[in-house]
């Protein structure tokens, strides 16, 4: 099914205003809890060995020029120095000629508060590449050509970028706080503005085979206040499924999303996950064809 460019532009405007896969805002993905270093460099975990996390997301798949996202995280933990080292790279294509690529090196130091609790303090540094290509954008009004505001050539801007955060964890819960892009007061076409995150997750044994993991996250950026409230159920810690509600309380009637996730773990080493997101609110006439695939490995 084809959807005209007007709806494509509406979809892009919605993503800009509602925090979901916007080039001017951080990646909002439904399986972020499994790997967090792109939004909090302290969220590295402390398992010996290395972890690799790969995620791809396409939003509103039946809309022309729909947003597309790619994310790669890698971490390694050393008990000898109580530290984690890693890297995160993400690509966010807004779909109207605007894209951003962000790459950062990650470091986190772990402090054993007592036998039950671990505090992780993290920082990451790198660069952001923002690009606008007018040849990939379809104009609604050709009279814009020639105006002083019209960008006729592809433009790219490279800028430094830094994140910092903290995370405390135990056997049954974790909580974190972070700030991303803390050098940038505001967002532009070529870089993201400062974001603040608070999140938490529990992990509770219900029976010998079943566990529940309630989760909560909150993100603040200027006039955006997005919350995620959800829960995942695990069977033998190998198969999981969950649901989460993700509204922006500043634009509650305009855009909300409900995500349904499922996945499995094989040989205590490999994970595969899938998420399907549905639209609610003013833009619920857009197709609920947002798909997200996740692969991760521990070695």
Give the label of every model feature segment.
Residues 2-12:
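Bacterial N-terminal signal peptides that target proteins for export
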Residues 24-299:
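Subset of outer-membrane beta-barrel
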